[in-house]
């Protein structure tokens, strides 16, 4: 079941929270709505569910206009962040609830309901918890019950509002993998809201990055990560180091140091320079592409790499994050090095300049 969102806007009073949103979600696709608080992602999800009404625009499911259709008629399953389980009902009864309140002509008999519920509990690995109450479950177990309940009525579309936000990091990681596997098995169309970049990157087929009621970028996790469409996306997705610089001719000046470029950019003057921690080069001696002196202040092993924090010596006031991969010569605290990078993203205000490479030789 595909979802077509065409020019949807939403106002709460005089405040606009969605501005002319257009987005297509393909059948069987899992899409993440990713953005900071106030970006409009939950409002958009609730409009798809029928829990909010758009001010303008059209919403269609597989070509059928559902803009005015009641939520109960949309065949949409909704999973909330805080589970919304019935405390007085057992796990079995919570999962069965949606089936028991279907219109009589669509309602299965009790034997069919029991069979369906037990199949779902087996799928979410909670068969032995059927007679327990929500108060007897962990957070991760409650969320799996909520997901089974949403799937019980065989929705065409599954919507999830920060489904793992209330769980600790380890449980979130396990449930993300489990949800991805479940999606690949059942092939339902799904849209989920998150502010967790790692969650969006790991689970989604495509990521929709939102900001202040607008869509900044839509793409696969690899596309939005490698080719950010705006400065906001660049800064929002993952850790990035930010330096103030200036372009003079074919030189990039950072903290009084001259870094030669392989071209002479059209733009001259002040720029903001962005480098990801793993794009930073670090050498014991200064080079053309690594002329900036630093001192190592923190070394944190992370399995197959080391996360370093280095303090610039006289050219930048904030510490710089660096990822180090060479296990044969791991830096120690107090060591002095020189950093730079052959690839940097440069912005003049919000305008992205062409990605520039530092010259390797004079």
UniProtKB/Swiss-Prot annotation:
Gene3D superfamilies: P-loop containing nucleotide triphosphate hydrolases. It is a peripheral membrane protein. SMART domains: AAA. The keyword Nucleotide-binding applies. Pfam families: ABC_tran. GO terms for molecular function: ABC-type sulfate transporter activity; ABC-type thiosulfate transporter activity; ATP binding; ATP hydrolysis activity. ATP binds at residues 35-42. SUPFAM superfamilies: MOP-like, P-loop containing nucleoside triphosphate hydrolases. It catalyses: sulfate(out) + ATP + H2O = sulfate(in) + ADP + phosphate + H(+); thiosulfate(out) + ATP + H2O = thiosulfate(in) + ADP + phosphate + H(+). Residues 3-237 form the ABC transporter domain. Keywords: ATP-binding, Cell inner membrane, Cell membrane, Membrane, Nucleotide-binding, Sulfate transport, Translocase, Transport. Its EC number is 7.3.2.3. It is found in: Cell inner membrane. GO terms for cellular component: ATP-binding cassette (ABC) transporter complex. The keyword Translocase applies. PANTHER family: SPERMIDINE/PUTRESCINE IMPORT ATP-BINDING PROTEIN POTA, SPERMIDINE_PUTRESCINE IMPORT ATP-BINDING PROTEIN POTA. The complex is composed of two ATP-binding proteins (CysA), two transmembrane proteins (CysT and CysW) and a solute-binding protein (CysP). Belongs to the ABC transporter superfamily. Sulfate/tungstate importer (TC 3.A.1.6) family. Part of the ABC transporter complex CysAWTP involved in sulfate/thiosulfate import. Responsible for energy coupling to the transport system. This is Sulfate/thiosulfate import ATP-binding protein CysA. It comes from Photorhabdus laumondii subsp. laumondii (strain DSM 15139 / CIP 105565 / TT01).
